[in-house]
From Swiss-Prot:
Species this chain originates from: Pseudomonas phage phi6 (Bacteriophage phi-6)
Function per UniProt: P1 is the major inner capsid (core) protein of the polyhedral procapsid, which is responsible for genomic replication and transcription. Forms a dodecahedral shell from 60 asymmetric dimers. Binds to RNA and may be involved in genomic packaging.
Keywords for the protein's UniProt record, in alphabetical order: Capsid protein, Inner capsid protein, RNA-binding, T=2 icosahedral capsid protein, Transcription, Viral nucleoprotein, Virion
Name of the gene encoding the protein in the UniProt record: P1
Protein name per the record: Major inner protein P1
GO cellular component, one term: viral nucleocapsid
């Protein structure tokens, strides 16, 4: 499906191997770093750049090809000094002296503007700072929409970037749908639930090594500080297998932060000026509470490695650490008292002038994952698909609603009331003003449970799998009973700590097939984010797959629902629903990947059932296929195609070579940005499984022809960009976000622009393949 040639890449760019950069988001939120091979030192880079600039000056190299090389440099952002690049770009007088027209074309292609006001013979006099600003605009920051399509994709996309802890005991999962085209509202879930676990993981981290890492990454955005802390915590967690010394953790954190940002830090340990001058670090340095406390501890006890009680750890150290790390984030942090609590960690973000309320909580019982829930509301009388109104619901109210989904391992709340009530065996009423509701939550128990002891004891017991004597005596080996006890305890604790919400006595309501469900009467002075088209969501999972539950009947918020009851006898842990309207069990996508290696054609087919057999559940493919996500991808796809068509038309009517090159540069930038996003999708979740299967089969074919050893996948690995792009397109088709015809049209446009060649120009792909 996606077959682009790499042969035509300019050979002079082969030295720039393994350079991978994806630019920066706004507010110094770095999402990538430049990875340089061992042989690619700055000395080599400078000599190569000088040689190529000399050739450009003599007119021997296509300025477009060399401009693409500069474009890759510019995308690196702070990882590779843009100032240094611009200095080299402007100081070589041979270029302007020998061929000013080539220089003008080169500048036009890089900046995307021919700038007719500057004459060709005066290009060399352009101030370096002006070109610097133009180069910085190349970092693709406007189209980060794939961070916001689905909760599943966000989880996998953020993991390799360090915003979440990959492969740890639990996974951060965040759901956020932004209003088009404001795709910058990344939820600050880096410091979500159970920070103590992350802190304890730092106990075995070599602080000197971490210091050296911070110092080496000094040119990067300050958000990488929390990224490295998270990565270090993950490494330490795997290394120590859960055996932590909390006191050593606190000492390590304070030592690291104190040495890095204390006013008394030796100059040689101080971060670079670039890092120090950013807003995040300025705020962090001004947070003297952490540093004063650190210095006082050293002064009083003579050393940083001190002993802290649990009370000190929970009431003083962790809040200090959270407060310090919050200054690195471009978003406002949750209140400390809510962040360190067990239930209802919330964040109030003022994004683009609009309030955005997020609740983050840990799914304790079934899956160690973090869920972020953003209440959103559409205009009921509008056909628009984008979320342009968010109700002003308080953090406390969101915190109270969170355990509702928490009980049944809900990754996020489902599409609308209809799905919840019909699929989850419950009933409910929401009055017309949206300020009062009666919700029926499923329980799968046969008798009521009285809260005759501390609810947190029950929660702790169920979290750890330890059932005390009283609970065991009441319901021996009764998993349903335990789940209900846990549910009741969580709800009781949540509402008891929230004066804004009043919950009546719960009661068991008989239902069909021996199942029961609870009824809670919840009322508040605030608007409740429940109702038709009011909540966008995710999935409720079960250990074994069930058939889809279709729902497509629009329900008005004022209606009273009596839901159908599911047979829960064989599903004791959670309920499974399909959170989308089109509930068909089949979908078509391009399942064949083809590639030419050494003039031989190889094709690998990847079927749906094979992907599911690898543990990739179908709902992980089709999770959250609401009209919102589909509308976003459609609008984004339309933007790319329409913009490319407009630029192509403008190029046909232009008579100025520099202006044509400027248009080519803009088209290339758009295409490269698009390809990187598609490739990113191809590296996540089910896309990675598709890549693995296709690679394995191509290896088998090559081995069968005697071209490689059975255990070698060398020749497949070098085509990783192409196969990841194919997988990304296939996943988008599986989700229904792109049709097969749209994907084919997209590949044609990208092929015409040679965007794939641009993506691989700075990697180790052999152009001879």
């Amino acid at each position: 499906m996606f077959n682009l040639k790499v042969k035509d890449l300019n050979g002079s760019a082969r030295g720039l191997t393994q350079a991978f950069a994806i630019g920066e988001l706004k507010n110094q939120l770095s999402v990538g770093a430049l990875q340089l091979p061992l042989q690619f030192t700055r000395t080599f880079s400078a000599s190569m750049t000088s040689e190529l600039l000399w050739e450009v000056g003599k007119g021997n190299i296509d300025p477009v090809m060399y401009a693409r090389l500069f474009f890759q440099y510019a995308q690196a952002g702070g990882a590779l000094s843009v100032d240094e690049l611009v200095n080299q770009f402007t100081e070589y007088h041979q270029s302007t002296a020998c061929n000013p027209e080539i220089w003008r074309k080169l500048t036009a292609y890089i900046t995307g503007s021919s700038n007719r006001a500057i004459k060709a013979d005066a290009v060399g006099k352009v101030p370096p700072t002006a070109i610097l600003e133009q180069l910085r605009t190349l970092a693709p920051s406007e189209h980060e929409l794939f961070h916001h399509i689905t909760t599943d994709f966000v989880c996998h996309v953020l993991s390799p970037l360090g915003f979440i802890l990959p492969d740890a005991a639990y996974v951060y999962r965040v759901g956020r749908t932004a209003t088009y085209p404001n795709f910058y509202a990344l939820v600050d879930c880096v410091r979500a639930s159970d920070l103590r676990r992350m802190l304890t993981a730092l106990s075995s981290v070599d602080s000197k090594m971490l210091q050296a890492t911070f110092k080496a990454k000094g040119a990067l955005a300050p958000a990488l500080i929390s990224q490295h802390l998270a990565n270090a915590a993950t490494t330490a967690f795997e290394r120590s297998r859960g055996n932590f010394d909390a006191n050593a953790v606190v000492s390590s954190v304070l030592t690291i932060l104190g040495r890095l940002w204390s006013p008394s830090t030796p100059k040689e340990l101080d971060p670079s000026a670039r890092l120090r001058n950013t807003n995040g670090i300025d705020q962090l340095r001004s947070n003297l509470a952490l540093f004063i406390a650190y210095q006082d501890m050293v002064k009083q006890r003579g050393r940083a490695e001190v002993i802290f009680s649990d009370e000190e750890l929970s009431s003083t150290i962790i809040p200090w650490f959270i407060e310090a790390m919050s200054e690195v984030s471009p978003f406002k942090l949750r209140p400390i008292n809510e962040t360190t609590s067990y239930i209802g960690q919330t964040s109030a973000i003022d994004h683009m002038g609009q309030p955005s309320h997020v609740v983050v909580y840990e799914d304790w019982q079934f899956a160690k994952e973090i869920t972020a829930f953003t209440p959103v509301k559409l205009a009921n009388n509008s056909n628009q698909r984008f979320l342009d109104v968010e109700p002003g619901i308080s953090d406390r109210m969101s915190a109270t609603l969170a355990p509702i989904g928490n009980t049944f391992a809900v990754s996020a709340f489902v599409k609308n009331r209809t799905a919840v009530y019909e699929a989850v065996s419950q009933r409910g009423t929401v009055n017309s003003n949206g300020a009062e509701m009666t919700l029926g939550f499923p329980s799968v128990v046969e008798r009521d449970y009285a809260l005759d002891r501390d609810p947190m004891v029950a929660i702790a017991a169920l979290r750890t799998g330890i059932v005390d004597e009283s609970l065991e005596a009441r319901a021996s080996n009764d998993l349903k009973r335990s789940m209900f006890n846990y549910y009741a305890a969580v709800m009781h604790y949540a509402v008891a700590h929230n004066p804004e919400v009043v919950v009546s006595e719960h009661q068991g309501v008989a239902a069909e097939q021996g199942s029961l469900y609870l009824v809670w009467n919840v009322r508040t002075e605030l608007r409740i984010p429940v109702g038709y088209n009011a909540i966008e969501g995710g999935s409720i999972r079960t250990p074994e797959p069930l058939e889809a539950i279709a729902y497509n009947k629009p329900i008005q918020p004022s209606e009273v629902l009596q839901a159908k009851v599911l047979d829960l006898a064989n599903h004791t842990t959670s309920i499974h629903i399909w959170p989308w309207h089109e509930a068909s069990t089949e979908f078509a996508y391009e399942d064949a990947y083809s590639v030419t290696i050494r003039n031989k054609r190889y094709t690998a087919e990847v079927k749906e059932f094979e992907l599911l057999g690898l543990g990739q559940r179908r709902e992980r493919v089709r999770i959250l296929k609401p009209t919102v996500a589909h509308a976003i991808i459609q609008m984004w796809y339309s933007w790319f195609v329409e913009d490319d068509r407009t630029l192509a038309a403008a190029r046909r009517t232009s008579r100025d070579d520099a202006e044509k090159l400027a248009i080519d540069g803009r088209r290339m930038q758009n295409a490269v940005t698009l390809l990187r996003k598609i490739e990113m999708i191809g590296t996540t979740g089910i896309g990675a499984s598709a890549v693995h299967l296709a690679q394995s089969r191509i290896v088998d074919q090559m081995a069968g022809r005697g071209l490689i050893d059975d255990s070698s996948d060398l020749h497949v690995g070098i085509n990783r960009h192409r196969i990841r792009i194919w997988a990304g397109l296939a996943v988008l088709q599986m989700m229904g976000l792109l049709s097969r015809s749209e994907a084919e049209a997209l590949t044609k446009v990208l092929g015409d622009s040679n965007a794939l060649g641009m993506v691989v120009a700075t990697t180790d792909i052999d152009p001879s393949l």
